[in-house]
């Protein structure tokens, strides 16, 4: 994943900062890796309720990941306050898991863990598909499981 930076001196990859050729290369790189991507897509997401929508999506993601026997979710770190909010959301979601199920969340800076860029690439490809640019989505369609989340925001 690190090679996707190219010759640019950037700390981490951002889908919205890539040109179409770079986006395609990123999706092709991702398609060549082992893995399966669960994507929680919340709607509606009003600008003033983004954190609430994120929490609803994160809660659903915990339930889905646990069903695949995932025990650790690594999220890209944000601020200490927002990271703590994520942790509280995961703690709350664990009450809906079967008794004795292990599940935890950790935060890592995006610049330190290139595998976190996969989430940005998948989200970008899915958003592009919803905007009518289906090529990116088609490259990874067999690797993605989309979960629609009603955010009630």
Regions found by a protein language model. Name each.
Residues 1-153:
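Phosphate-ester processing/binding pockets and catalytic centers
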């Amino acid at each position: 994943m690190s090679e996707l930076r190219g010759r640019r001196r950037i700390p981490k990859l951002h889908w919205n900062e890539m040109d179409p050729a770079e986006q395609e290369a990123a999706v092709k790189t991702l398609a060549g890796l082992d893995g399966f991507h669960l994507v929680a897509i919340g709607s509606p997401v009003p600008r003033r309720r983004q954190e609430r929508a994120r929490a609803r999506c994160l809660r659903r993601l915990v339930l889905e990941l646990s069903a695949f026997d995932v025990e650790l979710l690594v999220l890209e770190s944000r601020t200490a306050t927002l990271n703590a909010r994520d942790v509280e959301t995961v703690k709350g979601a664990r009450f809906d898991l079967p008794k004795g199920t292990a599940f935890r969340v950790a935060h890592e800076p995006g610049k330190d863990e290139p595998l976190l860029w996969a989430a940005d690439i998948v989200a970008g490809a899915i958003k592009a598909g919803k905007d009518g640019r289906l090529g990116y989505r088609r490259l990874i369609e067999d690797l993605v499981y989309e979960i629609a989340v009603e955010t009630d925001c």
